[in-house]
């Protein structure tokens, strides 16, 4: 269910961009190439989501949840998850001095210095982190968040492969976003609706008392 939900939600964004003439199907790729890309992208999505879910929902959220309320643990882990995606990878310093560490940190955080490049992407990623934490809380396992996460990563990696830009968005770019897919308000809205659906679906499920990274709290 998680993988299907993740893939369908962002497939809806892609279909809307095609339907409104924002992007077009990239017919330059053969069907064999499309299939090959889909297999590779899905494999990469599963691998990345597995590692990130173990870290952010398994270790970070799980550790915080043992000490704090769900709200505090979810907000903290979701904020960290969103911020990390905007960290830059600075070049290695030519020489090391007493201030090298702070200089490297400033370069890493430079991706957060331009609000137009940060919003609404950071809100979308924060909403994703919050939903995945909720799924972890309600199921007591990482399988559902792992599936959702893999479905979203698949489209983040495939959006520009399956489609090509057709229109000059201009001021509409705030709504549709760029080729990254996650930086448009449409994607944020779809993730928000997806969150409401899963929160409602899991709302009546009994809250597990404990969970390990992939199973139940010890």
Q: Where do the protein language model's features map onto the residues?
A:
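Membrane-interface helix/loop boundary segments of multi-pass membrane proteins
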Residues: 51-83, 87-100, 134-141
């Amino acid at each position: 269910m998680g993988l299907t939900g993740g893939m369908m939600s962002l497939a809806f964004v892609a279909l809307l961009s095609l339907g409104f003439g924002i992007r077009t199907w990239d017919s330059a790729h053969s069907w064999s190439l499309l299939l090959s890309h889909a297999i590779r992208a899905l494999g990469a999505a599963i691998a990345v989501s597995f590692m990130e879910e173990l870290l952010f929902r398994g270790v970070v959220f799980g550790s915080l949840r043992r000490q704090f309320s769900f709200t505090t643990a979810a907000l903290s882990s979701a904020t960290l998850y969103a911020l990390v995606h905007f960290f830059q990878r600075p070049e290695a310093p030519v020489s090391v001095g007493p201030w090298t560490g702070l200089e490297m940190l400033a370069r890493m955080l430079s991706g957060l210095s331009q609000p137009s490049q940060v919003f609404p992407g950071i809100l979308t990623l924060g909403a994703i982190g919050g939903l995945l934490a909720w799924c972890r809380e309600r199921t007591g396992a990482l399988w559902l968040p792992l599936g959702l996460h893999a479905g979203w990563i698949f489209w983040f990696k495939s959006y520009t492969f399956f489609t090509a830009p057709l229109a000059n968005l201009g001021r509409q770019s705030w709504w549709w976003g760029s080729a990254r897919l996650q930086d448009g308000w449409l994607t944020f809205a779809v993730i928000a609706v997806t969150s409401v659906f899963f929160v409602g679906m899991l709302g009546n499920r009994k809250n597990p008392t404990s969970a390990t990274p992939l199973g139940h709290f010890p």
